[in-house]
Each structure stands twice: as C-alpha cells, then as structure tokens.
A protein has these predicted regions:
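Long, terminal "pre-/pro-" and other extracytoplasmic accessory regions
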Residues: 6-8, 20-218
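Bacterial N-terminal signal peptides that target proteins for export
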Residues: 2-13
Length: 218
C-alpha cells in the first residue's frame, strides 16, 4: 500500500516538473542584454560652400595650368541659385574662362560649392576645349592683378548706393563679373544688383587691383 502511494506521489511530481518545463519552453524569450535593437541614424545634411570670387579664381587658375601651362584668364562671373543670392560677395557657383595662346583655344572652368543636383559637382570641373575668336587676346589678363576680392567689391558697392537698394529688397540678388577693360587698362569688378547682367537696378564698377570705386551705372 505504501509502495502504491509513493508511486502515485512520484508520478505526480514528475508530471508537475514536465508541465513546468513545457511552460518555460513555450513562453516568449526576452531580448538578451547583448542584443540591441537596430536604430536608424539620420544622415547629416551636407551644406553648400559659399566662395568669394578670388578663392574660386585661385582654384580654377591651378586647374587651368594643368590643362595648358600658358593658360591665362580672360573672364570670370558668379551665378545665382537657391543656395546663394550673391550678397556679401559670395556664391556657390563661379565660372572662369581661360585661354591658351599657343593652342588658340579656351576652356570654361566651374568652381562649385553647390549641393544642388542640377549644378556642377563640388570642386573644379571644366568644359570642352574650344577655339577662341579674334577678340579674346585683348581681354586676357595676368592672374596676379586680382588683389581685391569680390567681398571687398561688394562692400564698396554697398557704400556707393547698393545699401539703399538692399533696404528696398533685403533679398536683392547680386551678380559679379571680372574682366580686363582695355579702355581703362585695368582689371574690373562689376557688381550687378539684379538677377541678370542685362536687367539690373544698379551697377558698381570697382578696380580689382586697388579696390577703388570707379563709377556707378544703371
């Protein structure tokens, strides 16, 4: 009789142990301390780089020399886009034209700090080599003549009437061109208060070698 009781008790204990094991196996496992839930990290937005004209001019001059050791500049201009309105003498896009007298050709170089898809890639790039016309030689100038930067030209133009235009339109776009003027025999910054050189509210002409204000126009 005692043997039967012990058998019943032992069977009951084994049944309880088996049930406990089954419950433990079927319950959801918790995440171990070593397992980490993957998290998504936001990629930081790449900001555009705004350059002054002289900064880009130096970069483009170096690239032009690799193309042709005798390459000399004969024109540079800024461009407008959603990243820069040209104020303070800075832009994300500058284009320079360099000619090789021995090749009698020129190339357009672009200095870009833009992040826009429809603009030139970041850095300095160049276009195709093209034969230049008879007017180009008279426009060529030596790179060392550029002393006053575009931000200085902007500040000078502001003092001579540009600030009044800014009061009327704080987002006033500003464009810059750099050219040798055979008549003045000087390298000139021309500051255009407008969205294009043909349609501007005011123009300031500054000597790019001395920084001196020369004249205003419309």
């Amino acid at each position: 009789m005692n043997g039967i009781r012990w058998t019943v008790v032992l069977t009951a204990l084994l049944s309880c142990l088996l049930i406990a094991i089954m419950i433990a196996c079927s319950s959801p496992t918790s995440t171990s301390a070593g397992t980490q839930t993957p998290t998504t990290t936001a990629t930081p937005k790449k900001e555009p780089v705004l350059y002054t004209g002289k900064s880009c001019f130096t970069q483009m001059t170096g690239m032009a020399a690799r193309w042709a050791p005798d390459a000399v500049p004969f024109h540079m201009e800024s461009a407008l886009n959603s990243e820069s309105n040209g104020q303070n003498g800075k832009a994300t896009i500058w284009r320079g034209m360099f000619a090789s007298p021995t090749r009698r050709t020129y190339k357009v170089f672009t200095c870009s700090g833009s992040r826009l898809r429809d603009e030139a890639a970041m850095g300095v790039t160049s276009g195709a080599e093209v034969a230049y016309g008879p007017t180009v030689p008279a426009l060529m100038f030596q790179a060392f003549l550029l002393t006053a930067d575009s931000d200085q030209a902007y500040a000078t133009a502001q003092e001579k009437g540009g600030a009044k235009l800014m009061e009327k339109d704080p987002q006033q776009p500003v464009l810059y061109t750099l050219d040798w003027n055979p008549k003045d025999k000087a390298l000139l910054w021309v500051v255009y208060y407008g969205s294009s050189t043909s349609q501007s509210k005011g123009i300031g002409v500054i000597d790019a070698s001395t920084g001196k204000f020369l004249r205003a126009a419309k």
